[in-house]
C-alpha cells in the first residue's frame, strides 16, 4: 500500500473481530491511517450496538473487551462514522457500511443504490461485505474495498482500493495482495472459528 503512494490513507473500520489480537491491529492502524472510521465490530465492542452473543464464538469480541485499556476505549468511542473529502468537482465519502446505514449497511454488486447517491460528482468508499467491487456512474462511483484480513471471495487475496481524483474525474481501482494463509492458519487456527479458517482457504466467490 505504501508503495502505491497516496495523499491520505483511510481505514473503514473492523480492526477487531475474528482474530484474537484486535488491539495490536487497532494501534497499527491508528499510527498508519489518516482517517480511521468505526466499523460495526468496534461498535459491538464498546456496546454501541447489540449483537447475538452466540456469534461471539466467531467474532471473538467478548474475550478482548476486558483487555482494553481505558485509553483505547476512549479512542474507540471517538472513532467517526464517516469521512468526507471534497476536491474540485468530486465529493468523496467513506463509510464502513453504506451512506444510508453507516455501521451495518451492506452494498453488493447487485445492490440498487438509490438515485440520490448516484449523482455526478459523488464517489463513495465502503466495506463491511469483505467483497471488493466497483460501481460506476458519470463522474462518480462506488468502490467496496473488500478486506485486508479476511476476504470472503478469495481467501488468500487481501484487497484494498485506490481512489484517484483529478479535477472532476475520479478513477476507482481494487488492488489484490497475496495473503500467506498457511502462516496465518498455523498461527491462529486454535484461536479462530472453523468458519474463518474455511474463508481463508476459499478459492472462489
Label each region the model flagged.
Residues 1-6, 86-88, 118-120, 162, ...:
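Glycine-rich phosphate-binding loop signature in dinucleotide/nucleotide-binding domains
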Residues 1-73, 77:
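Core catalytic region of metal-dependent phosphoesterases/phosphodiesterases
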Residues 9-14, 35-40, 95, 123-128, ...:
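Active-site neighborhood of phospho(di)ester-bond hydrolases with catalytic His/Asp-centered motifs
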Residues 17-19, 41-46, 102, 125-136, ...:
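Active-site environment of divalent metal-dependent phosphoester hydrolases
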Residues 53-59, 88-119, 151:
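Active-site-proximal segments of metal-dependent phosphoesterases and phosphodiesterases across multiple
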Residues 108-145:
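Anionic-ligand binding region
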Residues 136-205:
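Acidic, His/Gly-rich catalytic cores of divalent-metal-dependent hydrolytic chemistry
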Amino acid at each position: 500500500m505504501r508503495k502505491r503512494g497516496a495523499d491520505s490513507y483511510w481505514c473503514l473500520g473492523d480492526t477487531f473481530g475474528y482474530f484474537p489480537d484486535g488491539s495490536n491491529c487497532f494501534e497499527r492502524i491508528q499510527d498508519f491511517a489518516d482517517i480511521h472510521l468505526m466499523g460495526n465490530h468496534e461498535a459491538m465492542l464498546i456496546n454501541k450496538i447489540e449483537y447475538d452473543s452466540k456469534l461471539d464464538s466467531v467474532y471473538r469480541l467478548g474475550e478482548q473487551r476486558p483487555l482494553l485499556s481505558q485509553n483505547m476505549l476512549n479512542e474507540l468511542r471517538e472513532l467517526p462514522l464517516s469521512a468526507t473529502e471534497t476536491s474540485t468537482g468530486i465529493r468523496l465519502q467513506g463509510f464502513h457500511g453504506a451512506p444510508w446505514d453507516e455501521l451495518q449497511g451492506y452494498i453488493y454488486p447487485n445492490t440498487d443504490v438509490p438515485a440520490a447517491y448516484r449523482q455526478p460528482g459523488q464517489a463513495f468508499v465502503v466495506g463491511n461485505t469483505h467483497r471488493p467491487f466497483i460501481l460506476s456512474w458519470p463522474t462518480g462511483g462506488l468502490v467496496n474495498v473488500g478486506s485486508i484480513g479476511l476476504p470472503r471471495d478469495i481467501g488468500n487475496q487481501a484487497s484494498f482500493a485506490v481512489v484517484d481524483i483529478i479535477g472532476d474525474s475520479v478513477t476507482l481501482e481494487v488492488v489484490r495482495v497475496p495473503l500467506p494463509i498457511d502462516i496465518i492458519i498455523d498461527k491462529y487456527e486454535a484461536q479462530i472459528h472453523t468458519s474463518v479458517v474455511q474463508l481463508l482457504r476459499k478459492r472462489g466467490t
